[in-house]
Every structure is written in structure tokens, then in C-alpha cells.
């Protein structure tokens, strides 16, 4: 199991949630100006994602990271967005001006940055990416020396320094940082990913369609699959700076499904722009989301005697069918608020080694410290190879309860959640569902949207309930439409 090392000397532990409901967990994000649930994110060249602010962010982070007389090192990676070059340069200027050495690794998946931060004994890792968002967005996310996302307290300290008017102590010219490019970073991650696959197995005879979303996995994912023996059919592996997530990848799996059916592949794999999440389809083209992958993986890990915590950690968004599938095998489902960082915190605090989100952020803690789309895909391929069964049959371990998810775009900074019309609509939906379903309404931590999720046995009924709540949110948000 990957060990949880100390992060910085002034931060002793990562605080874990005491309970598993989104309402009762620490609401640290309410006091934030820039950091959301997954770092800082926004449209490139528009506040806050401007080069001047990112330069200041680099200086603030460098000030916080610089503890004692030790020379500190930070890994910097990015996905394939055009604006990545601009933000990489801004971060380099800010960090090196504070005496921080920077190691640039180029376009690589987010989980590769987590791995390299540990492997190269760096003090921190930084990924420049907006994940599944369109190319015009970008973001900055931080990792500690243990390869885990920074705890809330440390992000808040960086933000405090960023917003303050204090004159930061600057190093003398002899003590400025240096920037160096690591040329073999891709090869290092390829070998690391392969170590998660059983040494006595190969993928010979398996035809795999892989959609890289024109993103960070465009080189590494096909290479890993090919080296393990698979026949690889690639999609979305020609990034041009503006086509990342553009009709391809985990948010748009239709092309993957179509290609699987055309070439009669055994499985389809689709990553998002930074490859920290994955969506898979079986040989018939049926989509398997993160909940199904968690169910399959949990049962296989239990069979092998390697599942810890007697269950799985997921979020309040996970389908009730996952909970039922696990319960049938004597396993529990622990739920956290939305965000893979909170899933990981609960896993660490309570001894679990498997967790994730319905969206495809899956954490196999024995292999990596963050959601890793490639390692998640390899775990499914290993299961297919071990069981010698088609994926459609393996996926039958879980029966989904009908679930509807709708999004409403709102004005940035607005909060319609306390509006009486919204409160009344939610109460009415809860009354109609009773004990036969559930409703969850929450603001996104990464986009100006409110997400409405309704579960129940009747698809038409829950769709109508979700639409009613969305209409109330639209009215409370002065006419902003559906997203």
C-alpha cells in the first residue's frame, strides 16, 4: 500500500471527516476565493486563470513550500491545452523566483504527476489541467510529497498568501531556483502503470479500443496496452491544443462505443483530458461507469483476500445498486461528499484500499494515491483475463437503480440554494419519493452549475421530479439555462 508520508513540517495530519454525509463534513470551501474541490479552475486568460495571477500563485506556493534551509523541488506537468504553455511559464517564473527548483515533465496524466512527485522525492507536484472541461478552460492542482492532493488547510494557506499584501522574503540571485526538463518521465510512468498489472498475465488476443480525448494520455495509454500484448485501436490521440475533450473521451463515449461495435472489440476504454477518470464499455457497447467498476473490483479483491476495510468508499452520488451489490456479499459502502479528495481522506482514515466516484475517478490505493484512469482500466482488463469471461457477463454483479442527473447553469458567485422556490421544490420531491428513492441537490465545486440527482424505481417519475427542481433553480437564478 502506498504510504502516507508527512506533507510539510507545519502540517501534522490530514483531517478526515468524522461522518459520511455532505452536510456534516467540514465546509472549508465556503471560505475560499480561488480553490475549489479540485484546485483552481476557470477560462484561460480570464480572472482568475490569468498569467499574472498564476505567477503570483507560483510565488505564494513557493513561499509556503519553502521551509528551512533545504532546497525544495516541485514537479510540473500539464495536459494538451494550448494555454498550458502560458501557465507553465508563469508558474516557473513564480516558483523559481522564490528559490524553488522545478522539474518539467510535459504532457502527462494527472496521476503520473502524483507518482513522479513521490518517485523523484519532490516536495510538491503541480498539474496544469481543467480535466474534462473544454480546451478554453484550464486549472492548477497541487500534490504533496506523498502524491496526494494537498489538504484543505494548506490550500487555504497558499490562498491567504496569494491574497495578502505582505512583502514576501525574496532569495538572493545566488539562491534562485532552476528549471529542468525530465526527458524520460513518460517512460517512467509507463513502467509504473504496468506494475499494477499481474506479472503472470498478458493481454494477447484482446482487442481494445482506447479513446484518449486528445488529452494527456494520448501517448502513454496506447503504449501500455500494446506493451502488455493487446491489439490496440486508438481514438482521440491527435491533440492540437484546442481539441481536448471535443466530442471525445469519457464525457462523449459515443465514438468509442461505435468503434467497439465496428471492429468487434472486446472492450472500450475512454479517458478524460487528464486521464484521472475512465469510462468503459463492454463488447456490446454498453457503458460501465465508476459504480459498476467499483462493484466488479471489490468482489474480485475480496475473492483474492486483498480488499481492506470490508467495503468500498464512494460518494453520495453513487447508485443505490452499488450499495445493494456490496451488501449481498457482506460488504459495506461508506459515502462521502462529492470529490475524490474526500473519498481518499476517508479511505486513509478508516483503512480502505478501494474507493471512487460514479464519474470514473477510481482510487486503487495499493497502486496510486489519486484517481488513475489507466490503472483502473488495467484492473478491469486483468479481471477479464483472469476470469476468461466477456465483460458484459462480469458487469452483471450490479443492477443499477434508475438515476437521473440534470445540471443547471447559474451565474458565477450566485447561490440559489436558499431560495424559497428551490427549497419548496426539493421538499415536494422528497415527499413524493418517500423511502423509495432519494434526491441530492448540490453546487458544483468546479463549474458554475447546480447538479440535481434523483433515484427511484420509476424513470419517468424521477425525471419529472428532477426537471421540477431544475425549473425552480432556473427561476431563482434569473433565467440561466440548462447546462
UniProtKB/Swiss-Prot annotation:
The gene it comes from is: glmM
Q: What is the lineage of its organism?
A: Bacteria, Pseudomonadati, Pseudomonadota, Alphaproteobacteria, Magnetococcales
Which positions bear Phosphoserine? 131
Q: Which HAMAP family match?
A: GlmM_B (MF_01554_B)
Top-rank taxon, per record: Bacteria
Which cofactors? Mg(2+)
Tell me the protein family, please.
Belongs to the phosphohexose mutase family.
* Pfam families xref list: PGM_PMM_I, PGM_PMM_II, PGM_PMM_III, PGM_PMM_IV
Say if the entry is tagged with keyword Isomerase: yes
> For this protein, what is the EC number?
5.4.2.10
Q: Which reaction does it catalyse?
A: alpha-D-glucosamine 1-phosphate = D-glucosamine 6-phosphate
Q: Which InterPro entries match?
A: A-D-PHexomutase_a/b/a-I (IPR005844), A-D-PHexomutase_a/b/a-I/II/III (IPR016055), A-D-PHexomutase_a/b/a-II (IPR005845), A-D-PHexomutase_a/b/a-III (IPR005846), A-D-PHexomutase_C (IPR005843), A-D-PHexomutase_C_sf (IPR036900), A-D-PHexomutase_CS (IPR016066), Alpha-D-phosphohexomutase_SF (IPR005841)
Q: Which NCBIfam families match?
A: glmM, PRK10887.1
CDD domains named among the record's database cross-references: GlmM (cd05802)
Q: What is this protein called?
A: Phosphoglucosamine mutase
Give the record's PTM text: Activated by phosphorylation.
Amino acid at each position: 500500500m502506498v504510504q502516507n508520508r508527512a506533507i510539510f513540517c507545519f502540517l501534522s495530519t490530514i483531517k478526515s471527516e468524522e461522518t459520511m454525509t455532505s452536510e456534516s463534513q467540514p465546509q472549508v470551501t465556503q471560505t475560499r476565493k480561488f480553490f475549489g474541490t479540485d484546485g483552481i479552475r476557470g477560462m484561460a486568460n480570464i480572472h482568475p486563470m490569468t498569467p499574472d495571477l498564476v505567477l503570483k500563485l507560483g510565488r505564494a506556493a513557493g513561499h509556503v513550500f519553502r521551509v528551512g534551509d533545504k532546497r525544495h523541488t516541485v514537479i510540473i506537468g500539464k495536459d494538451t491545452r494550448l494555454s498550458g504553455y502560458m501557465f507553465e511559464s508563469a508558474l516557473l517564473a513564480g516558483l523559481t523566483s522564490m528559490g524553488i527548483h522545478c522539474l518539467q515533465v510535459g504532457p502527462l496524466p494527472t496521476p503520473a504527476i502524483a507518482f513522479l512527485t513521490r518517485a523523484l522525492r519532490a516536495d510538491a507536484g503541480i498539474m496544469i489541467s481543467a480535466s474534462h472541461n473544454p480546451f478554453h478552460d484550464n486549472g492548477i492542482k497541487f500534490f504533496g510529497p506523498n502524491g496526494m492532493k494537498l489538504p484543505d488547510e494548506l490550500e487555504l494557506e497558499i490562498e491567504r498568501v496569494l491574497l495578502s499584501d505582505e512583502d514576501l522574503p525574496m532569495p538572493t540571485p545566488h539562491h534562485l531556483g532552476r528549471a529542468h526538463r525530465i526527458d524520460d518521465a513518460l517512460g517512467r510512468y509507463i513502467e509504473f502503470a504496468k506494475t499494477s498489472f499481474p506479472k503472470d498475465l498478458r493481454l494477447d488476443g484482446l482487442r481494445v479500443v482506447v479513446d484518449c480525448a486528445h488529452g494527456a494520455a494520448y501517448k502513454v495509454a496506447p503504449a501500455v496496452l500494446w506493451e502488455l500484448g493487446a491489439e490496440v485501436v486508438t481514438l482521440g490521440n491527435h491533440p492540437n491544443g484546442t481539441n481536448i475533450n471535443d466530442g471525445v473521451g469519457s464525457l462523449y463515449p459515443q465514438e468509442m462505443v461505435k468503434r467497439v461495435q465496428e471492429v468487434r472489440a472486446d472492450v472500450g476504454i475512454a479517458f478524460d483530458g487528464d486521464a484521472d477518470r475512465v469510462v468503459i464499455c463492454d463488447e456490446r457497447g454498453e457503458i460501465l461507469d465508476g459504480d459498476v467498476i467499483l462493484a466488479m473490483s471489490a468482489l474480485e479483491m475480496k475473492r483474492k483476500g486483498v480488499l481492506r476495510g470490508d467495503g468500498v468508499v464512494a460518494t453520495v452520488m453513487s447508485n443505490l445498486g452499488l450499495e445493494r451489490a456490496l451488501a449481498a456479499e457482506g460488504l459495506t459502502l461508506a459515502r462521502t461528499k462529492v470529490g475524490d479528495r474526500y473519498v481518499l481522506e476517508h479511505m486513509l482514515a478508516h483503512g480502505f484500499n478501494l474507493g471512487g466516484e460514479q464519474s470514473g475517478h477510481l482510487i486503487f490505493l495499493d497502486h496510486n494515491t489519486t484517481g488513475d484512469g489507466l490503472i483502473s482500466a488495467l484492473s478491469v482488463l486483468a479481471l477479464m483475463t483472469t476470469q476468461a469471461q466477456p465483460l458484459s457477463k462480469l458487469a452483471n454483479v450490479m443492477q443499477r437503480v434508475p438515476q437521473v442527473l440534470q445540471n443547471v447553469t447559474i451565474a458565477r458567485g450566485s447561490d440559489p440554494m436558499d431560495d424559497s422556490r428551490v427549497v419548496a421544490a426539493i421538499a415536494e420531491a422528497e415527499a413524493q419519493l418517500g423511502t423509495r428513492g432519494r434526491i441530492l441537490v448540490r453546487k458544483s465545486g468546479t463549474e458554475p452549475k447546480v447538479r440535481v440527482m434523483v433515484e427511484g424505481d420509476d424513470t419517468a417519475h424521477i425525471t419529472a421530479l428532477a426537471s421540477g427542481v431544475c425549473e425552480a433553480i432556473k427561476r431563482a437564478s434569473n433565467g440561466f439555462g440548462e447546462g
